[in-house]
């Protein structure tokens, strides 16, 4: 994760071991989760939300470009660390690196993680503005080639149709 340029707490100490599995204690990262900022009823500046969407997209893009995929990326697992100066960019921390797996397809990885980010607000009835969704997707895509971009949007469209179909079945 560090090689990919993603802020994530480093495990402090092993707490428990069961066979080949370890439970590690992670340091506490102070701040609000991305989800808390989106659902906050307090007035939050649009610039802050745009920067948050851009930062989330960068995290998704960096994970995917590193040949990885976070199989359970949620807005609750990204902490926005408070900054003392207004001019400094937001510091986003991925606090749940447990779901990281290898991925052989950049576009599959991007779609999977963006889809996972969208599920929680949808399930809670939180309307995320389209502008924030677009900023997040653009930031995640970065400099993809035209062919990869086309493939990405085909997969994303299929994913959206599948999720709508599943929602109607319930």
List PLM regions with ranges:
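Conserved ATP-binding subdomain of kinase catalytic cores across diverse folds
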Residues: 1-34, 61-66, 170
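Active-site-proximal flexible loops/turns
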Residues: 17, 34, 79-84, 103-105
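Conserved kinase catalytic-core helix
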Residues: 2-8, 37-71, 76
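A glycine-centered beta->alpha junction motif in the catalytic cores
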Residues: 28-44, 99-100
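Conserved protein kinase catalytic/activation segment
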Residues: 77-94
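C-lobe/activation-segment region of protein kinase-like
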Residues: 90-166
